[in-house]
Amino acid sequence: MEEPFLLRDELLVPSQVTWHTNPLTVELKRVSRLAAPMATVTIAQYLLPVISVMVAGHNGELQLSGVALANSFTNVTGFSIMCGLVGALETLCGQAYGAKQYEKIGTYAYSAIASNIPICFLISILWLYIEKILISLGQDPEISRIAGSYAFWLIPALFGQAIVIPLSRFLLTQGLVIPLLFTAVTTLLFHVLVCWTLVFLFGLGCNGPAMATSVSFWFYAVILSCYVRFSSSCEKTRGFVSRDFVSSIKQFFQYGIPSAAMICLEWWLFEILILCSGLLPNPKLETSVLSICLTIETLHYVISAGVAAAVSTRVSNNLGAGNPQVARVSVLAGLCLWIVESAFFSILLFTCRNIIGYAFSNSKEVLDYVADLTPLLCLSFILDGFTAVLNGVARGSGWQHIGAWNNTVSYYLVGAPVGIYLAFSRELNGKGLWCGVVVGSTVQATILAIVTASINWKEQAEKARKRIVSTENRLA
């Protein structure tokens, strides 16, 4: 039974190939149909906390500093972990769907939620002491107090996210991106309304946006849960197999922990970058400029993340279905989208290099500095888009551990030391720090390219078969 399964795409009878029937063209259309909605979804999800910070900032400079600090701390210690762990579902749910093991998909998603909740309790304990932690690290007591209060009201949002992200991956791996699109955009609009109501109508100050974020995440969780429960599209996959629950949790952590390491190591690097900028000769200027560059970079990255999610889904589905060569074509299709997307946004950014800074500041010094760093930012766009796609391949294939080790070597053994050396020893300041990021991304991209090019896709399909179809928890 296994041989036809593994060689399904090799048994297809060749026919005359035209542009419309070319495998790459066909797969490019499929990936694009997933990538476009998912890019919108990731942007909407990214804007939830951004809108909260923007609204909180209208309460004053002190409040903005406290909220920004809380947002940074909670991202590093909580939200990044939740986002990372769920990468396991891109492997497990995606390959199960491709293998038509529909009853396993719901079990994997529910096991992820059950695994996330205890972790949220542990993170919440840490968040309760944020004020004391920040003061012990030398932060201003008043800013620390605001950050601690803001983080406290974000705790419910963490639990909401623990439900939202697994359900999102549950739908994504089945190709159900239109419901994801509508729920994400609806939640964003709801969040704007709740933010305005709590801050300006009820006068809850800078805690209002945090409360709004928590309410919005739970609103998001409820509408996603309702869709999963009542939609006919999920009829085959929303079931729960109790006998597989424990083994599903084990598999979730096997792939989730290295997946979380992949995400967290990357997120944490940029927080270290901002901290280092505060030690430079002109800390106010350097921190402001690097924060602007990081914001621009993140806005682009969430678009690349949408493409990566689409590629991950197609790769995992095809490996689970025993179509290794189609999985390989999915990678090529993702890289084609990367070329178009990164070229477009890099050219756009470079063209607007002298005016984009006005979105953040009116200071000529800041504007000139941002324009000076724009070529490096364009290079980051290209590299990060490339690595995002290949990291999506890693998650879809189930080799998150390689991605985790790659990020450790690329960013912390190469990129960070190079950046610190250029910034402080060579006195390149913020430009030196960002050069370190570019060097680290280059190493990361090179390693990922070598690993991806050397993949034996037939072997990956065999591993997917053993990982998903086996009645026991045989880990590939």
UniProtKB/Swiss-Prot annotation:
Keywords: Cell membrane, Membrane, Transmembrane, Transmembrane helix, Transport
Taxonomic superkingdom: Eukaryota
GO biological process, one term: cadmium ion transport
Transmembrane segments: 35-55, 66-86, 117-137, 146-166, 184-204, 208-228, 260-280, 289-309, 331-351, 370-390, 402-422, 433-453
Gene Ontology MF term list: antiporter activity; efflux transmembrane transporter activity; xenobiotic transmembrane transporter activity
Compartments (UniProt record): Cell membrane
Homology family: Belongs to the multi antimicrobial extrusion (MATE) (TC 2.A.66.1) family.
Protein name, per record: Protein DETOXIFICATION 1
Record gene name: DTX1
